[in-house]
Amino acid sequence: MRKQNFVLAVLVLALAQFLALPGRALAADNPFQRGPDPTSASVNATRGPFATSQMTVSRLSVSGFGGGTIYFPTSTAEGTFGAVAVAPGFTATQSSVAWLGPRIASQGFVVFIIDTVTTFDQPDARGTELLAALDYLTTRSSVRARVDSTRLAVMGHSMGGGGTLEASADRPALQAAVALTPWDLTKNWSGNRVPSLIVGAENDTVAPVATHSIPFYNSLDAASEKTYVELAGATHFAPNSPNTTIARYAISWLKEFVDNDDRYEQFLCGAGAGTEATVDDYRTTCPLTN
């Protein structure tokens, strides 16, 4: 009996120590937390902790958008994942932002990078297409069982960034929006309540920050949370190539609001946030509430 009691005591102690490991208490409290505790190196990395795969969705098999490519974690051992639909800019195709697919998916998300119905579609059309893509992803796609349909986000570049704001204004149940050097004729987004990350570029002559990104950010007075990152010395087309600063803030934003993962707030609100040489201007509503 004494031996059994001793063994039981050892097991209880071991379990207590296991639960006390970094991230364990948070994981128990937050069922949406995915992956190990993040570091600055891990959010900057070209690949995260999850192995990924991808599948092509033909435009002939869908309606409301132009098909695309789905990037997703291969393992579901940690459960389902939040998802984000991504739209390219004016005259561009999914290939222009394809680098975001495996980079974000490997951090624990299902990423659907879409083609638009036509490459000339305007922001409002792109917003509608982003929502159609999310609907397809969660109801008809072959990876729908991997997706938590309550944890969805939108992202886009240029007119796709404008489409991101259009989509989040139309569907306030979205968990997050990430607009990359966004362009839109609409300047007032005061009714948009979705937590929004706006990424502008200092030398953008297509969508100058003074008439696009900054007014967009300032008008988001109803958004529960918002952050503005301006890329130092960058042009409108910075999101078309792998960019560590864009990835760092986009991943952290999605983790914070799609996964409710406060472990990533340090990269948005910590002492080093916005102080990188690659950032020219940084504005935020920190501390953040997800």
What residue spans do the PLM features occupy?
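Short alpha-helix in the alpha/beta-hydrolase fold that links the catalytic acid
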Residues: A207-N218
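Short beta-strand element of the alpha/beta-hydrolase
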Residues: G79-G89
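Gly/Ser-rich "nucleophile elbow"/oxyanion-hole loop immediately N-terminal to the catalytic nucleophile
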Residues: S75-T80, Q122-G162, R263
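Short amphipathic alpha-helix adjacent to the substrate-entry channel of hydrolases
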Residues: S95-D115
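N-terminal cap/lid segment of alpha/beta-hydrolase-fold proteins
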Residues: A28-G79
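Short beta-strand/loop motif that positions the catalytic acidic residue
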Residues: N192, I198-G200
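Acidic catalytic loop of the alpha/beta-hydrolase fold
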Residues: N203-P208, H236-F237
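Alpha/beta-hydrolase-fold serine-hydrolase catalytic core, especially in secreted/extracellular enzymes
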Residues: A232-G233, N240-N290
